[in-house]
């Protein structure tokens, strides 16, 4: 059996699909071979956003979008294979997360769309998908799942570490020797900042946090956002656009006597993301020594600096310091979940998700 897997991740940032070709050794240690990104066309991004709130004709719109996503995922696989000089028959499976459009574990479901049967047909490769549903069925949140991979890849006997992922949502994994691993979604990462930046500058994200750095934090707005009850809920917990969307921000802004300048709102959103992350680490990871950051937020210098400022005495660095690229951690993690599925080994950490026990995650769509 080949030990090459393609991991695919398209997250809440909605910037596209990250694909990575990974070889695993017998212990499940990853060796990335090649990677590729296929950006989402704007029409696809808008179609995903339109499915976030409950609305009209959802089933038809969801299935039409699922077909389009399968085509994008197949394109990513094809171009990744071309880049790496590999053939479809060299690959054991594509482990594809799909695109989250609704996450409601308290109602017993989570929805990641993408026509995986069509992806298997187009790619000519086995597809493993639907990784979150089994954890939810077992009473868990179905998220975050990446800490299970991070525990094996990044634990240290000598350093108390937190692995921080800053995508659309931020989440942490506490990796302290001698303690049970925990992990949870802290709150917004880039999601609110990206949406605000696009609305007011036409740019999809704030390059290096420069726009935010030129603004001033608006204390009443920051206080209103920090009053969000989710932030003080105990873990396990998970969140997404179902809570932290444009409507949520509009409600906070609408309650102010007057609207701050857009740049000041951006500065406040950055401070809010950093504060949510720092507060979570300080409360749930006492004695922590280092924070290693992955995801798109690792490239936001202003955000990284603000997190470091709020965590004095702790090292804050991009996860490249531990030997893997920041932007590919989630895609590698889902490749690893595919590798675990093939061996019928559990892929969740109940201490992170709240599930009743370890579960094999995923469903197979044969080529």
UniProtKB/Swiss-Prot annotation:
- Kindly list the positions annotated as binding ATP: 11-18
Any one GO molecular function term: phosphotransferase activity, alcohol group as acceptor
**Gene3D superfamilies membership:** 3.30.420.40
Q: State which pathway it belongs to.
A: Amino-sugar metabolism; 1,6-anhydro-N-acetylmuramate degradation; Cell wall biogenesis; peptidoglycan recycling
Q: What is its EC number?
A: 2.7.1.170
Q: GO terms for biological process?
A: 1,6-anhydro-N-acetyl-beta-muramic acid catabolic process; amino sugar metabolic process; peptidoglycan turnover
The UniProt family comment states:
Belongs to the anhydro-N-acetylmuramic acid kinase family.
Name the UniProt record assigns to this protein: Anhydro-N-acetylmuramic acid kinase
Q: Which organism is it from?
A: Chromobacterium violaceum (strain ATCC 12472 / DSM 30191 / JCM 1249 / CCUG 213 / NBRC 12614 / NCIMB 9131 / NCTC 9757 / MK)
As recorded in Swiss-Prot or TrEMBL, the protein's gene is named: anmK
